[in-house]
Amino acid sequence: MTGESLDGSLHALTIELDALRRENANLKQQLKEKDGACGELPMSLEEFQRYGRQMIVGETGGLSGQVKLRSARVLIVGAGGLGCPALQYLAGAGIGHLGIVDNDVVEESNLHRQPLHDTSKVGLLKCDSAKEALSRLNPYCSIKTYPVRLSYANAFEIFPSWDLILDCTDSPMSRYLISDVAVNLGKTVVSGSGLGTEGQLSIYNFENKGPCYRCFYPIPPRPGSVVSCQSGGVLGPCIGVLGIMMAVEALKILFGIYTLENFKPFLMQYSGFPYQTLRMFKMRNRKQGCLCCGDNPTITKSTIESGHIKYEAFCGAINYDVLSKDERLSASEFEANYWSQKERGFVCLDVRPRLHYEISHLPGTYNMTVKELDEMEGSIEELQKHIPVITPDLDIVVLCRYGNDSRLATRILKDKFKLRNVRDVKGGYFAYIDEINPSLPKY
């Protein structure tokens, strides 16, 4: 190619570049005119329309308040009964960035109280199901998922990039961990819990000034005293109310309604039955001697990450590993060696709560709870008042819902009542349904 042809090509490219620049400038001007005469807008016109009826509520702070939400980063730990409604309303309100920590999968038994999920999502990770639903609800919301179980080993990797934490978990162990990590990172926590038809919520470590969860509860609950949703049940709308109230508290924090000058620690208690009631209790400020947020804390980032803080042991987790392999039966072994036999020279004791037992049970079984067994003196005569046919040498098979309480009951029967031939069914009543008789109802 000659110098003359190169000059010609360069000239042509220069002309084309100038044309593209003019086109770009025209497009920018058209966009400005479309957005209005007020110049650069902090949101798209679609977002103005979407959040308009929220922005005109005085408490939200108008446009400036909405811009705060748009840039906010909120992490929700747990996409269950509390997390689902909280996520829905926070995404709907226009939170710009949401994080979801949950390693559970959607089960059919979740759907009555976790409205982000639906039947088609059964078997999917909850965080993925929630992300899909929230993205349909609000495409302007960026969502990051963490399909992991929160632990001391990963909490300090997950929490730092988020402005606000919502604790929507269902165990004291998780609540202590979340609070401890939040204190060490200077994060505020909105914490809720619910069971049956009631629940409560609080705000911990507001603006890193306390109080924290340990200030409220320096002593953990007694082992076995904490009832889960699986065993105690939950009414969907009641837990939903609490999740929505958590979203309200989160928005108040992000709007700047609460300040260091006006914030007072509180505990809010909700009850759905027999009449709906909501009570607010004033709580004390940060305890100077608190092990985490006090003047001389011993619960630090290093002690947490090292595993030195034994959350499970501190919260009195029940040790179910109390039987040898020989003291346990599979559902198939129970069916073949006991239940299917015409001559039943054994007793089957179902230790689920009475309400569970009445929903569904195997015919001919007896029903007593672990608590009832534990509270007895330990004489065979006392036990015979409830199970007349029982003798010290009779074969006894113990059944519960999942195969946990039955282990404890088996140990009690052998150690306290000195019964020789007692075994439990691994996986409990539900394992029997899955493996032997799927026509029985699960609940």
UniProtKB/Swiss-Prot annotation:
Domain Rhodanese: 342-441
Enzyme Commission code: 2.7.7.-, 2.8.1.-
Keyword Metal-binding in record: yes
Subcellular location: Cytoplasm, Cytosol
Entry annotated with the keyword Cell inner membrane: no
Residues that hold Zn(2+) according to the record: 212, 215, 290, 293
Protein name per the record: Adenylyltransferase and sulfurtransferase UBA4
Organism: Eremothecium gossypii (strain ATCC 10895 / CBS 109.51 / FGSC 9923 / NRRL Y-1056)
